[in-house]
């Protein structure tokens, strides 16, 4: 998927079924390396990043069958250096390192790829593994890691909150000798889901979801069954789609408690919101949204992966709104494309200032990353005229059947 034709002036109404969380599914797939037992994992989204992860696992010797529910057997792993052409495609491939080290005592991987959003250093991953006793050499863009015997449990104080590094350390510590404490850990729902999965296999992890996670190392893990949590970012994206178009939507198979900050901001913008056990209903019919002031922050704060979508919302809202990005630098590239569509946006350091206008205009735009792709497609849906969104190959990395789902609620999107 390279280029999309998006018809504008659409009001988006209807029902959407939310897919499994990419940000939980990817690390969980790599965590299967930790055990010889047979595993079943359900609610796996059909995404290019997921498919690349599966190819990586198969290359290592993992046996995988199924589609949305996968049966995985990692008992026959016999390769410890995945190929560059796969590693380079997704940044999540760094999560292979901890499980290989913990179970086999060795791993060699090239520096990973993925979305180009500023600087995303892996120092915290490597420092954590070093503190657990691993020897790590970094040369020619390749990480060569090994440990004699088992990794050793340790108290680890994270220099800064990092979801990725928390996952790496937690997975490696699962099979370490002794206990590990991760202080200043990330608290995201995906961390909780990964810990739940590992505990299902026999790990001893408590505290996931707080800033202090305690892992008591075990000798080995067994098999088990797990259901991946819903994708909170996909949910938030569809809620913004309805809000920005002055429509109404019900998101099914989702988890409202994972979106507290997003729902608060949508309510502040004027949306009527109702929630149930696994659904969220938003109604913005006949109302132009009110502008919002937002600051991204680690969970339970406002998610960085939703700031582009809310920048779109601010662009067509009443008043002047601001969004301050505190997680990643260089994450405002998409704003130049919204400006091309008529948005009045100024950037000041790590803050964007949006002066809302009633209507965007169609244009030929280019997406720079995953969330920018979704945002520009939504912008095309509500703008006047026909918008062409280029470089949408990013989209299938993190949204399952996004154009198809939008078309079901009133959009008219075609692959060119």
Swiss-Prot record:
The modification 2-(S-cysteinyl)pyruvic acid O-phosphothioketal is found at residue 115. The active site is at 115 (proton donor). Its EC number is 2.5.1.7. The keyword Transferase applies. It is found in: Cytoplasm. The keyword Ribonucleoprotein does not apply. One of its GO terms (molecular function) is UDP-N-acetylglucosamine 1-carboxyvinyltransferase activity. It is an enzyme of class 2 (transferase). Pfam families: EPSP_synthase (PF00275). GO terms for cellular component: cytoplasm. GO terms for biological process: cell division; cell wall organization; peptidoglycan biosynthetic process; regulation of cell shape; UDP-N-acetylgalactosamine biosynthetic process. InterPro entries: Enolpyruvate_Tfrase_dom, Enolpyruvate_Tfrase_sf, MurA_subfamily, RNA3'P_cycl/enolpyr_Trfase_a/b, UDP_GlcNAc_COvinyl_MurA. Pathway: Cell wall biogenesis; peptidoglycan biosynthesis. Phosphoenolpyruvate binds at residues 22-23. Keywords: Cell cycle, Cell division, Cell shape, Cell wall biogenesis/degradation, Cytoplasm, Peptidoglycan synthesis, Pyruvate, Transferase. Belongs to the EPSP synthase family. MurA subfamily. NCBIfam families: murA (TIGR01072), PRK09369.1 (NF006873). HAMAP family: MurA. Cell wall formation. Adds enolpyruvyl to UDP-N-acetylglucosamine. This is UDP-N-acetylglucosamine 1-carboxyvinyltransferase.
């Amino acid at each position: 998927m390279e280029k999309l034709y998006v018809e504008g002036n659409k009001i988006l109404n209807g029902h959407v079924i939310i897919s499994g969380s990419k940000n939980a599914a990817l690390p969980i797939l790599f965590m299967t390396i930790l055990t010889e037992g047979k595993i079943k994992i359900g609610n796996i989204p059909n995404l290019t990043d997921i498919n690349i992860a599966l190819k990586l696992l198969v290359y290592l010797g993992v046996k995988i069958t199924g589609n949305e529910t996968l049966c995985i057997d990692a008992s026959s792993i016999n390769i410890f250096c995945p190929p560059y052409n796969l590693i380079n495609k997704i940044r999540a491939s760094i999560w292979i390192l901890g499980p290989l080290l913990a179970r086999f005592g060795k791993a060699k991987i090239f520096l990973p790829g993925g979305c180009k959003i500023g600087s995303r250093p892996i120092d915290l991953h490597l420092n954590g593994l070093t503190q657990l006793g691993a020897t790590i050499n970094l040369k020619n863009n390749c990480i060569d890691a090994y440990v004699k015997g088992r990794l050793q449990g340790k108290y680890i104080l994270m220099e800064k909150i990092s979801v990725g590094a928390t996952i790496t350390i937690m997975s490696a510590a699962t099979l370490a000798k002794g206990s590990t404490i991760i202080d200043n850990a990330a608290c995201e729902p995906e961390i909780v889901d990964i810990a739940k999965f590992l505990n299902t296999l026999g790990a001893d992890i408590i505290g996931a979801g707080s800033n202090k996670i305690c892992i008591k190392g075990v000798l080995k893990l067994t098999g088990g069954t797990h259901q991946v949590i819903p994708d909170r970012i996909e949910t938030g994206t569809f809620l913004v789609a309805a809000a920005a178009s002055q429509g109404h939507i019900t998101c099914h198979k989702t988890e409202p408690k994972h979106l507290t900050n997003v729902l608060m901001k949508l309510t502040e913008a004027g949306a009527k919101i109702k929630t149930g056990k696994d659904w969220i209903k938003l109604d913005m019919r006949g109302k132009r949204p009110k502008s919002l002031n937002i600051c991204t922050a680690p969970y339970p704060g406002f998610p960085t992966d939703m700031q582009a979508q809310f920048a779109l919302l601010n662009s067509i809202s009443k008043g002047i709104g601001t969004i301050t990005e505190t997680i990643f630098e260089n994450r405002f590239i998409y704003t130049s494309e919204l400006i091309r569509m008529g948005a009045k946006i100024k950037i000041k350091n790590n803050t964007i200032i949006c002066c809302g206008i009633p209507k965007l205009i169609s244009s030929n735009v280019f997406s720079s990353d995953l969330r920018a792709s979704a945002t520009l497609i939504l912008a095309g849906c509500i703008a006047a005229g026909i918008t062409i969104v280029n470089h949408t190959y990013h989209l299938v990395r993190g949204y399952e059947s996004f154009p198809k789902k939008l078309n079901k609620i009133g959009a008219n999107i075609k692959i060119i």
